């Protein structure tokens, strides 16, 4: 599966940036998402999207406030990574 995804990404010239946290989404005139503002070691950078933005950001298992708000039960264990803090979900909700 990953081979097929990797091949399609390379064939289409799609750029993937790792370790590049998104600070906020950029909206266009009709409120569509037109790009992102990233922030890293080199400072903030605006990145325009040609055909869309994919938020591959995980869940919110490490965000206590969001768990209280959205989970009906109180799970004891989770298999998520520490980076699942709901940042991407909150950015999309802010639109």
Model region roles, listed by residue range:
Residues 40-95:
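Glycine-rich loop(s) and the adjacent beta-strand/alpha-helix scaffold that form part
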Residues 1-44, 50, 64-65:
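Conserved redox-cofactor binding core of oxidoreductases
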């Amino acid at each position: 599966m990953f081979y097929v995804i990797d091949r399609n990404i390379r064939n289409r010239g799609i750029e993937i940036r790792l370790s590049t946290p998104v600070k906020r989404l950029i909206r266009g005139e009709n409120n569509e998402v037109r790009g992102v503002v990233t922030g890293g070691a080199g400072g903030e950078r605006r990145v325009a999207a040609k055909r869309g933005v994919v938020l591959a950001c995980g869940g919110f298992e490490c965000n206590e406030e969001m768990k209280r708000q959205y989970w009906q039960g109180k799970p004891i264990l989770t298999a998520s990574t520490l980076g699942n803090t709901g940042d991407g979900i909150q950015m999309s909700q802010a639109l």
